[in-house]
Each structure stands twice: as structure tokens, then as C-alpha cells.
UniProtKB/Swiss-Prot annotation:
Disulfide bonds: none
Residues modified as Phosphothreonine: 260
Organism: Arabidopsis thaliana
Name used for this protein in its record: DEAD-box ATP-dependent RNA helicase 6
CDD domains xrefs: DEADc_DDX6, SF2_C_DEAD
Length: 528
């Protein structure tokens, strides 16, 4: 069989192996093939295209006209549509490659992002109205400060997150990324280490939970990420946020803390766990027993990192890191970073991306007052504040466990509802108090500094320092319990003669101003 016949078998009539063009051996089925036309010279620089001739089997002139009207323009239109689709695909590919060139980090993960983008781009055509099916919570119309509103205008969709994760984000009540989330999420998704410093109540939890959940593979039943927190209450709160954000994902979240049944935790770890949230001591204990296997854990998050790197926790964390793979990613978040953080960063973080959104340490939306009182006048002053202020919920801080219990008893005797919580309580009792106060079962909570770290209760608009804190760092975290996520709050400090020097020192170290309390406090500064 010769090449000409092979060409005729492989290619359509009139097209040879070298491309479009007449085949000299091709015999047309049309007995009257169209003759080459001589182009007439005209004013137009380009020759007119020859019109197609209708086949001989079309007998009438009307049939021939319909053939030309239907066939020829339709071919032109199909070619134009094909060219437009090719141009659009080329533009999308160029945009993706330009975006890819700007992203630092692991190229393999960027490939995964590109595949996710392409797959979701295909599904977008069929699911353009997916947001219409969301069960959104009531919109929070309270005033917000620039801490959370001064954003770059990004949307959560800009980070190419999983559709089911986006559903959880929006149904959680997140509308747009806060400044710390805008800075952290895209960097964390590239696999880089992060050292982030941001104010209390500006969305740090979402800044590390969202990229952590995005990078977890639900099909791989191993522990892929660990979130470390310094307190049991913060562990419960963080795990609850993770569960709410991932409710449409098949991600198993486990929380483990000291004070709970070790046997129950061991039994739970025999089931699939993708994300582990807990305190360092308990997780280290489980890892030493060989029950908590961390060899596939590629992500370690440290919330309230300054507290985690204190003398109390740092040895446990350094020992725990030895159970992680060498290619781990570490994310550190806090409002303050002492010297110990820098030494830890130099030893364990690999070229970390530094984020510092702390132009001012104290929150912009919290108004701070002080009242000079004698020790024996404090309870009477507190009673006056309760009667004068419009309190949604308040947290009252004392410096010792005994003073917490005594003050809670006094407040109850005055006729106000009150809970108290401190570190010496049984863990089940602490959990119940925390849960009930968060759900609004009581208006006032008396506690020690145990409750200063990361606890997020949106209804709290008043913080009262019954005892002035011993350090400026503790003051910062106490005040941060009000004015959450840019909302307005009020902090009142009951200051004795012995406390005045600590208050002045706190003002200097934090660069803030604590004003004397006026006779009448405008509700607009803490109730909007």
C-alpha cells in the first residue's frame, strides 16, 4: 500500500500529511468541481473569500440558498468561538503562571493549588449560586475599629480555599479577612514558617485555623497538624472553632488537655485524628507513650507563643518538636514577643516570614479608666460600677485564688449573678463554668490571670481589674478580653496607693493612657 493511499485513509479528503492543501491523487465525488477563481483587482487590499457551491443533489434554488445560509456562516461562527475559547484558556494559564511565580514556598504544594483552581473553575460554571444556600448567622452591625477594618480588600475566595471550607467560614460569621488573616493565610499556604504579632481580638485564631484546615488531607488518617495552647479553656475554644469551620469537611478534630481522663484520650487516638489541639504537657505525655504518632505531622501551630515559651512550657515544647518530621512547618502567633521567642525562632524556624501589626499594643476600641481607692473601699466601688454601667457581660480580675472566691461571694451577697473560675478548680467544673458563662447564663465572672489568654467571648464589653495586674503584659491581655474583633469595650482599674507606680510603668511600657474615671461614663464609648 503506497503512501498516497495511506494519507487518504488517515486524513479527510483534500488534506494530506503535510496539512491543508489539494491532493493530486484525490478524485472528488463532485462531477463538476469548482474552478479556481481569478481575483479582480479592487480598492480593497484583501481578496474576497470564495463562496461555497451547493452540492448537485440540491435541485431547487431555495434549497441551495438555505444550504449556504446555514452551513457557511455556521462554520465561521464555530471557528470564531473556538479561537475565543483558546484565547481565554491562554490568558487564564498566563495569569496562573504569573501568580505562581510570585508565590514563595514548596513548588509541589503550588501544583496542588493550581489543580484545585482548575477543578473549582470547572465547577463554578455549575455552582455560581452556591452562596445562596449558606445558613448565615445574623449580621453583627456593631461599630468596629481600624484594627480589623483597615484591610486590603481581599476576599476569602482569593486564597483558592476548598469550597466546603469556604462554606464553614461564611457560616461561622466571617465576612472578610481581617488584617492579620490577610497577611498570614497566603503565606501559611505556601509552607513557610511564620512569626506573627498582632493585637488581641483581631482574628489570630482564624489566621492559623483556616490554612491548617486547608492543608489537611481527610483521606490520610494520620495526625497532620498540632495546635498548642497554654490553657485548657483556650484549647476547648480553639478546637470548637476548628470544628465549626470544618463542619463540611471530613476532618477529625481532637482536643486533649491535662486534668481530663488519659485513658479516654488514648482510646480516642485509636480512631482517625487529623488535627490535634491541646496543651503541651498532655500531648508530650501521649507522644512518649507511643499513642500519639507525630511522624507525619507537617504543621505545628503555637498560639499565645510568648506564654508557651515561658519557663513552665518551653522544655516540653522543645522535647515535643523532636517527635515531628524535619520538614515541619511552624506558625507562631501572639500579641507580645519577649526575648525567649527570638532564641526559639533562631533555633527551630527556617527563614520565617515576620508579620508585625502592633503599631499600638493596646486595643483601639477599649477605653481605659482608673479610680484611686483604698483596699477596704473596693467592694463598695465595684457595687457603684455595677449600678452605673450598662454591662452586657463583665470579667473581674483578681491576683490570687483566695481573693477570687471571696469576691465572688461578696458580689453574690450584693444581689448580682456571678460565676468564678481559677486554676485550682476541678477541670470538669472549670469546663462547665466556662461553657455556661459563654452561653450567657451569668453576667459577671471573677477569675485570675488564667482567663487572660485568648478567651473570646463576644458579649464581654467591660473588664474590671479589682486587683491591678503585676506586669504590663498581664494588663494588656486582661484588657484584651473586651473589645473583641474591633468592637468597643471599657476597662476600669481599681488602683490603691501602692499600685500607682505599677500603673504609671504600664502606661510607659505600652505607650497608652489610662484616664481618671469621670462621674458619668458615656455609654456610646463601650456599648455600640
Amino acid at each position: 500500500m503506497n503512501n498516497n493511499n495511506n494519507n487518504r485513509g488517515r486524513f479527510p479528503p483534500g488534506i494530506g500529511a503535510a496539512g491543508p492543501g489539494p491532493d493530486p491523487n484525490f478524485q472528488s465525488r463532485n462531477p463538476n468541481p469548482p474552478q479556481p477563481q481569478q481575483y479582480l483587482q479592487s480598492r480593497t487590499p484583501f481578496p474576497q473569500q470564495p463562496q461555497p457551491q451547493p452540492p448537485q443533489y440540491l435541485q431547487s434554488q431555495s434549497d441551495a440558498q438555505q444550504y449556504v445560509q446555514r452551513g457557511y456562516p455556521q462554520q465561521i461562527q464555530q471557528q470564531q468561538q473556538l479561537q475565543q475559547q483558546q484565547q481565554q484558556q491562554q490568558q487564564q494559564q498566563e495569569q496562573q503562571w504569573s501568580r505562581r511565580a510570585q508565590l514563595p514556598g514548596d513548588p509541589s504544594y503550588i501544583d496542588e493549588v493550581e489543580k484545585t483552581v482548575q477543578s473549582e473553575a470547572i465547577s463554578d460554571s455549575n455552582n455560581e449560586d452556591w452562596k445562596a444556600t449558606l445558613k448565615l448567622p445574623p449580621r453583627d452591625n456593631r461599630y468596629q475599629t481600624e484594627d480589623v477594618t483597615a484591610t486590603k480588600g481581599n476576599e476569602f475566595e482569593d486564597y483558592f480555599l476548598k469550597r466546603d471550607l469556604l462554606r464553614g467560614i461564611y457560616e461561622k460569621g466571617f465576612e472578610k479577612p481581617s488584617p492579620i488573616q490577610e497577611e498570614s493565610i497566603p503565606i501559611a499556604l505556601t509552607g513557610s514558617d511564620i512569626l506573627a504579632r498582632a493585637k488581641n481580638g483581631t482574628g489570630k485564631t482564624g489566621a492559623f485555623c483556616i490554612p491548617t484546615l486547608e492543608k489537611i488531607d481527610p483521606e490520610n488518617n494520620v495526625i497532620q497538624a498540632v495546635i498548642l495552647v497554654p490553657t485548657r479553656e483556650l484549647a476547648l475554644q480553639t478546637s470548637q472553632v476548628c470544628k465549626e469551620l470544618s463542619k463540611y469537611l471530613k476532618i477529625e478534630v481532637m482536643v486533649t488537655t491535662g486534668g481530663t481522663s488519659l485513658r479516654d484520650d488514648i482510646m480516642r487516638l485509636y480512631q482517625p485524628v487529623h488535627l490535634l489541639v491541646g496543651t503541651p504537657g498532655r500531648i508530650l505525655d501521649l507522644a512518649k507513650k507511643g499513642v500519639c504518632v507525630l511522624k507525619d505531622c507537617a504543621m505545628l501551630v503555637m498560639d499565645e507563643a510568648d506564654k508557651l515559651l515561658s519557663v513552665e512550657f518551653q522544655p516540653s515544647i522543645e522535647e515535643l518538636i523532636q517527635f515531628l518530621p524535619e520538614s515541619r512547618q511552624i506558625l507562631m502567633f501572639s500579641a507580645t514577643f519577649p526575648v525567649t521567642v527570638k532564641s526559639f525562632k533562631d533555633r527551630y524556624l527556617k527563614k520565617p516570614y515576620i508579620i508585625n501589626l502592633m503599631d499600638q499594643l493596646t486595643l483601639m476600641g477599649v477605653t481605659q479608666y482608673y479610680a484611686f481607692v483604698e483596699e477596704r473601699q473596693k467592694v463598695h466601688c465595684l457595687n457603684t460600677l455595677f449600678s452605673k454601667l450598662q454591662i452586657n457581660q463583665s470579667i473581674i480580675f483578681c491576683n490570687s485564688v483566695n481573693r477570687v472566691e471571696l469576691l465572688a461571694k461578696k458580689i453574690t451577697e450584693l444581689g448580682y449573678s456571678c460565676f468564678y473560675i481559677h486554676a485550682k478548680m476541678v477541670q470538669d467544673h472549670r469546663n462547665r463554668v466556662f461553657h455556661d458563662f459563654r452561653n450567657g447564663a451569668c453576667r459577671n465572672l471573677v477569675c485570675t490571670d488564667l482567663f487572660t489568654r485568648g478567651i473570646d467571648i463576644q458579649a464581654v464589653n467591660v473588664v474590671i481589674n479589682f486587683d491591678f495586674p503585676r506586669t504590663s503584659e498581664s494588663y494588656l491581655h486582661r484588657v484584651g478580653r473586651s473589645g473583641r474583633f474591633g468592637h468597643l469595650g471599657l476597662a476600669v482599674n481599681l488602683v490603691t496607693y501602692e499600685d500607682r507606680f505599677k500603673m504609671y510603668q504600664t502606661e510607659q511600657e505600652l505607650g497608652t493612657e489610662i484616664k481618671p474615671i469621670p462621674s458619668l461614663i458615656d455609654k456610646a464609648i463601650y456599648c455600640q
